[in-house]
Every structure is written in structure tokens, then in C-alpha cells.
Amino acid sequence: MQFKLLSAIGIIIIVSGHCYHGGMELAYNWFPPYSYNLALFVFISGYFYKTDYEENIGKYIWKRTKRLLIPAYLWNIFYGGMVAFLGLFGFTIGAKPDLYNLFVMPFVDGEAFQYNLGSWFVYPLFLVCIINVLFRKFLKLIHLDNEFIVLIVYLAIGMIGINTAIENPTAINGIVKLFVRTMFFLPCYEFGRFYKAVLEKKDTLNNVAYFAIIFAVQLILLTFCEELEYTPSSFTNFNNGFVIPYISSITAIAFWLRVSRLLVPAIGNSKFVRLIADNTYGIMVNQLVGFMCLKFVFYGLSCITSGSLFGDFNVASFKSSIWYYYLPNGLQQWAFVYLIFGLFVPILISIILNKICNIVHPSSYLKKT
């Protein structure tokens, strides 16, 4: 249950990062979300890696393709159609739904149609899964299958990726962006596997000492480093070199690991937590549509009441920018409502699709996404 809760916390942090932190504070002053949010997500994926996958690599690759790639491409096609449809009503959000943006752009960028821009992470994560299982199979064949070796190699690759972005910022586009994203994710994935295989059984330090160490390290980072946050989607703003991003990821992951462990007894086998944790894929892909649904509510009420309600709603911005957020009276607290929509509209979509797919085909690709 600890990792269910950690998954729920992780996706809440990611979604809130797209809507003014969701109008709430989750230790963001200490752990800036864009210094670790995707790293935490990939860490969780790595934690659930099993060495059994190496026995039948073809089956594993096909399983990852069904679980990650095929749904992402289907969603991309859907949102391409949505861009074309909304374009009939004056919406200019998203790129032209041509063959390139439908089938190539998802892999090299993932943000063409905007409404599903959160899905960009699927493609480098897929490559990480494939590279990881192949590399581990190779190490096993030469009798060097050791978690320390994997960790060192992946860290070297990740740091090379970050350094490439630092030294050649204008070159980070197209297929290069896919490569450096994948390189960056590799150590984060191994952090999860390394924790499960090596560290978890040794994770017994008392809470006072544990948190004292984490906050001491984090305070040093905040004091002596520039802005800790970077932008993983565009792979930019690595202002502190190629080592600090991984250190800040480790401290934040360690913090939330222990917090989730401490909260489990109070939460128990919460259906609410499981609902969020079991739908992280759908939330990641469809969160922006959740935000748009709330904006449509504001827009509709403004039209129905002839501006008596929400009269300052900016229709032009609503139709032209996915990042326009209407906050009544400028209240940041409304960001919490955006967070709720960003979480539960995608969950509702996933539930409906799963019910439909279970009727049509019980082994649907979208099951449990």
C-alpha cells in the first residue's frame, strides 16, 4: 500500500504543477516540484521491475507496447481529431493534425496537440523499459548482473544527457530530445530498482535522524545552488550542472518515501488512494482535458448569465492557449478545483472506457490505465 500512496502523491504533485500547485502547499518550498516530479514517477516504475522479465524479452516488450505505446498513440489520434473539431469553433490550440503530428511527433516531442501534452513521458519511459531489460540480459550473459554496475552505468548515461543539453541547448529538438529524455530517465528508473533490490531492507533509520539528514542536504542545495527546478519536457534550465538534478531527485524521493510509509497506517487500504494510484497513466495523459472541462463550465456560465457570472472570463485566451486558467476574483484557491478536475475527469474517462472495452473485449489495451 505504501507505493500505491506514493503513486497517488506523485501524480498529484505532477498535476498540481500544471495548475498553480493546486492552490496548496506540499513541502514545495523545501522540495520544488520540478526538481523531482518526473524522477519520482519513473522511480516508482523502476521499483516494480522484475528480473523475471529477462526470461522472455519479446513478451515483455510486447507487454510494454500494449501498456504504454498503443494507448498513447490512440489518444494522440483522438486529440488530433479533437483539435480539428474545436478548430471549427475558433479554437487555435494545438498543431495541424497531419500524418507527421499524428504518428511521428509523439515520439520526438509529444506535445503537438497540447490537450495530451502530458503523454510525452510515455515514449522515453517505453525506451527506458526496453533498454533496461536488454542491458540487464546482456549483463546476465556475461555474468555481471549487479545492481551497482547498472546504477553506475545509468548515472553516467543520464549525466551525459544533461550535459549535452547544457552545452548544446539549441540542439535539443526532434529525435535528440527523445534521446536525452530517455538518458535522463534511466538513472531514475534504476533508483527504483536499486531501492527495492538493495536498500529497502536496510531502510530502518529512525524518523528523526532520517528527516534530519534529508532536510540538511536539501538546505545545502537550496542555499548554494541556483534555481533547483528544471524543465524535463523541453529538457532545459539545468542551471546546476549534471549532478545536482539527481541529488535533488534523491532527497525528494527519500522524503516522500518515508512520508508515505508513515501515512499508510492512518490511511489503510483506502479505495480513494487506490482509485488515483491505479489511474496514473490516464491522469497523466488527460489532465489538461480535465482543466479544459472546468474552463468550459466557467465559459458556459458566463454566456448563460450574459456576463453576470464570470464576466471577466477571457474567451480569446481560452480558445488560443492551453495554459489560460480563469481564477474567479484572481483567487489562487480556485487552483485546487482545477486540480480536482485534472485528477477526476481523467479517472472518469478511464472508468467509462474500461467498462466499454470490457464489454467489447475483456483484454482491452486500456484496462487499468
Where are these regions (language model features)?
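Alpha-helical transmembrane segments and their immediate juxtamembrane cytosolic regions
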Residues: 1-369
